[in-house]
Amino acid sequence: MAQPKKKTSKSRRNMRRSHDHVATPNVVYCECGEPIIPHRACSSCGSYKGRQVINSEDA
């Protein structure tokens, strides 16, 4: 197996890892006031873009 010729410094290691973070998800608020992920139907009221797409009994 290949072995590194030089020890990787903490600075170089951390610079390489600078893009490895987890992005925070976008949150929008439904008409009912519930926070939801964009482009998804609301799980509490069942609406999407102002229309009822899921029955209230199912949601």
Swiss-Prot record:
NCBIfam families documented for this protein: rpmF_bact (TIGR01031)
Gene Ontology molecular function: structural constituent of ribosome
Record-annotated membrane-spanning stretches: none
Organism per entry: Maridesulfovibrio salexigens (strain ATCC 14822 / DSM 2638 / NCIMB 8403 / VKM B-1763)
Pfam families: Ribosomal_L32p
This protein's UniProt keywords: Ribonucleoprotein, Ribosomal protein
Single GO biological process annotation from the record: translation
Alphabetical list of Gene3D superfamilies matching this protein: Single helix bin
Residue stretches of biased makeup (Basic residues): 1-19
Family per similarity comment: Belongs to the bacterial ribosomal protein bL32 family.
GO cellular component, as recorded: large ribosomal subunit
Residues covered by region (Disordered): 1-20
InterPro entries xrefs: Ribosomal_bL32 (IPR002677), Ribosomal_bL32_bact (IPR044957), Ribosomal_zn-bd (IPR011332)
Protein name: Large ribosomal subunit protein bL32
Coiled-coil zones: none
